[in-house]
């Protein structure tokens, strides 16, 4: 069961349950393994997704989307993408990503 988070949240936060994030997080958001996040709001920081996690970004991340080997799809906006494991981040045609930084 997915929980909804809304409003203004002071981060950093670690997501340990399947979550739909609608609000604004000031700070980094870390998604743990085996957890799914649907991001419709904004992260004013980095979105860090651990191996085995799932993140679907419809909203915006002002910092980097850092993928440690998770299933990550960006259809919104991100400052940058860093793929640090497989599979690589999927970036849809409508997404806006300022830069991609693969090691």
Which positions does each model-derived feature cover?
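Extended beta-solenoid/beta-helix repeat architectures
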Residues: 1-103
């Amino acid at each position: 069961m997915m929980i909804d988070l809304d409003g203004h949240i002071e981060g950093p936060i670690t997501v340990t349950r399947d979550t739909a994030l609608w609000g604004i997080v000031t700070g980094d958001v870390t998604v743990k393994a085996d957890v799914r996040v649907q991001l419709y709001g904004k992260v004013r920081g980095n979105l860090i997704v651990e191996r085995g996690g799932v993140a679907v970004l419809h909203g915006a991340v002002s910092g980097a989307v850092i993928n440690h080997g998770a299933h990550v799809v960006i259809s919104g906006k991100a400052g940058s993408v860093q793929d640090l494991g497989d599979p690589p981040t999927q970036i849809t045609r409508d997404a806006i990503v300022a830069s991609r930084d693969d090691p």
